């Protein structure tokens, strides 16, 4: 990176301070004080738009794993005892109620009291379990969590790995028999392979490799990176293809700006964790292409990120919370990789939008969706998909990346 392209210390420190305050005084404070359940344990599955918790709501493995990951990562990075306490609360509930003691892996959904409601074994949820458990091990050294993460990895590789075409069967029943319907939700295309699931397998395997650098895991992680470069990333457009058949033939024309910018930094993180220097230039090229395409096509005049371009070419201009969070990290990452100041300015712009429109200054946390005119939708603050992972992780990543930039400035 050219030193002439680094913003001055004042700008870097100001952004870092704002991000730190948002993380500790809004996001994590909300989750630590407004969402834990003193009756059933763990965390509630729903908080309404009015901020009222619904302790009897069903609980999803994805939300609970994301809560565990967020507080474990916050404790590891910031050292605040409360964050360890919250992570341990999430860990205890997750292991007690989501883990299938008979067949292994984690259930899709349980009741508040822990009774299984949906026993599917979706690879997306298994991946978040690995991601969270390996982070808890990173933060505390807990060996039981690492053993559980490894067991889930083994189950994925045994029952879901496609040794012919690459990638993974995405959904199984409780006993790990493949399911025909692999969709995460009703809005997904009815196709057997998706970018989304494979992105989060890659994310999880990279975190597991940090604490368990095993040869087979390295090979599987490298195969995932190469799958993205070969089939999922489209070099002609700078976007990710979202859905495929079993042979990785495209079955989608939609564009997800949030996933594009998220993948732009997760792919580089994975190749760096793996230490694959020969593969890195190709990943960096794809990463910067994804970031440039997002900047050119997905950014609104106010600096925020539009949601997506649908299958029929319609631009969805709503501002969902998670693409804004991923844009903060992705644009900072693109700046660190390229030295091009327009990426740093894009990160500042999306942060300004977050502070002015996406965060809820009265009720806490962030609005799930905001209209093009700046008005928030009356969506739940916490639900099956809305957790502290995207915005919490974005803040943790930004703090760390800004620290590195400040060190670079001081060393000049």
UniProtKB/Swiss-Prot annotation:
The keyword Kinase does not apply. Keywords: Isomerase. Its EC number is 5.1.3.11. InterPro entries: 6-hairpin_glycosidase_sf, 6hp_glycosidase-like_sf, AGE/CE, Cellobiose_2_epim. GO terms for biological process: carbohydrate metabolic process. It catalyses: D-cellobiose = beta-D-glucosyl-(1->4)-D-mannopyranose. Pfam families: GlcNAc_2-epim. One of its GO terms (molecular function) is cellobiose epimerase activity. Optimum temperature is 80 degrees Celsius. It is an enzyme of class 5 (isomerase). Optimum pH is 6.3. Belongs to the cellobiose 2-epimerase family. Catalyzes the reversible epimerization of cellobiose to 4-O-beta-D-glucopyranosyl-D-mannose (Glc-Man). Can also use lactose, epilactose, mannobiose and cellotriose. Highly specific for oligosaccharides linked by the beta-1,4-glycosidic linkage. Shows preference for lactose. PANTHER family: N-ACYLGLUCOSAMINE-2-EPIMERASE. This is Cellobiose 2-epimerase. It comes from Rhodothermus marinus.
């Amino acid at each position: 990176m050219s030193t002439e392209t680094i913003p001055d210390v004042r700008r870097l420190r100001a952004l870092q301070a704002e991000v730190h305050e948002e993380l500790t005084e809004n996001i994590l404070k909300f989750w630590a004080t407004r969402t834990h359940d003193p009756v059933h344990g763990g965390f509630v599955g729903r908080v309404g738009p009015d901020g009222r918790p619904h302790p009897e709501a069903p609980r999803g493995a994805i939300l609970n794993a994301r809560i565990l990951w967020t507080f474990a990562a916050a404790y590891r990075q910031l050292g605040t005892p409360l964050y360890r306490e919250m992570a341990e609360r999430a860990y205890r509930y997750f292991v007690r109620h989501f883990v299938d003691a008979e067949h292994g892996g984690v259930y899709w959904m349980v009741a508040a009291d822990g009774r299984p409601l949906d026993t599917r074994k979706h690879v997306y949820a298994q991946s978040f379990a690995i991601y969270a458990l390996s982070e808890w091990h990173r933060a505390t050294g807990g060996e039981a969590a690492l053993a559980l993460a490894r067991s889930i990895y083994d189950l994925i590789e045994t029952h879901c790995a496609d040794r012919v075409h690459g990638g993974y069967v995405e959904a199984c029943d409780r006993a790990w028999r493949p399911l025909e319907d692999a969709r995460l939700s009703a809005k997904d295309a009815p196709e057997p392979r998706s970018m989304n699931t494979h992105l989060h397998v890659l994310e999880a395997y990279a975190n597991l490799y940090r604490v368990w650098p095993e040869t087979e895991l390295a090979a599987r992680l490298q195969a995932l990176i190469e799958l993205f470069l070969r089939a999922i990333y489209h070099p002609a457009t700078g976007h990710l293809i979202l859905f495929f058949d079993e042979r990785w033939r495209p079955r989608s024309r939609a564009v997800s700006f949030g996933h594009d910018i998220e993948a732009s930094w997760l792919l580089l993180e994975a190749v760096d964790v793996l230490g694959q220097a020969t593969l890195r230039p190709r990943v960096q090229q794809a990463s910067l292409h994804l970031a440039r395409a997002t900047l050119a096509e997905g950014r609104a005049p106010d600096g925020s990120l539009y949601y997506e371009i649908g299958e029929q070419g319609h631009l969805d201009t709503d501002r969902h919370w998670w693409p804004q969070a991923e844009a903060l990290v992705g644009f900072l990452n693109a700046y660190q990789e390229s030295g091009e100041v327009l990426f740093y300015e894009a990160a500042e712009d999306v942060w300004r939008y977050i502070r002015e429109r996406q965060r809820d200054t009265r009720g806490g946390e962030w609005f799930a969706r905001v209209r093009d005119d700046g008005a928030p939708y009356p969506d739940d603050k916490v639900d099956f998909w809305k957790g502290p992972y995207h915005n919490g992780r974005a803040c943790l990543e930004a703090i760390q990346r800004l620290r590195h930039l400040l060190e670079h400035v001081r060393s000049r």
